[in-house]
């Protein structure tokens, strides 16, 4: 099998999309009744990096995955002593970490029903859990092999491995997926 055969096969695939409701801004996602943009059982983690981290309570609104506060010094005193106070709404651009190779993975289905996933990921245990959950497998049926990666900087987390694994199971053949740089950017990853 070759890339040309894969291209020919891909041309035969018919895809039907079901439009889902969208919350495309933070404000829209936080509004009452907003469509869910994440699984409510999934909590974010590691959002706060710093010496003084306080985690908030876990009774979070539906589209909030984590709440972390960083506190250092006396904020009231800081405002009292400030010569100038600027209040505004700030919008930050998307950040691309610029790792050496884009997202890539290969999934090899075994005769036993087990899968071996070779992934350029920073989260091998999350990847194993997500692949198993997506395919209804036991975690023990999924082996993740992590070769050296050319950087990730927090961006290489589970994204395409469950898709790649599903295709491998459906076809009964190894499946390799590697994004081009433009596909990596368009996939909404990283942050």
Question: Could you describe each region identified by the protein language model?
Answer:
Residues 1-191:
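Structural alpha/beta core scaffold segments of enzyme domains
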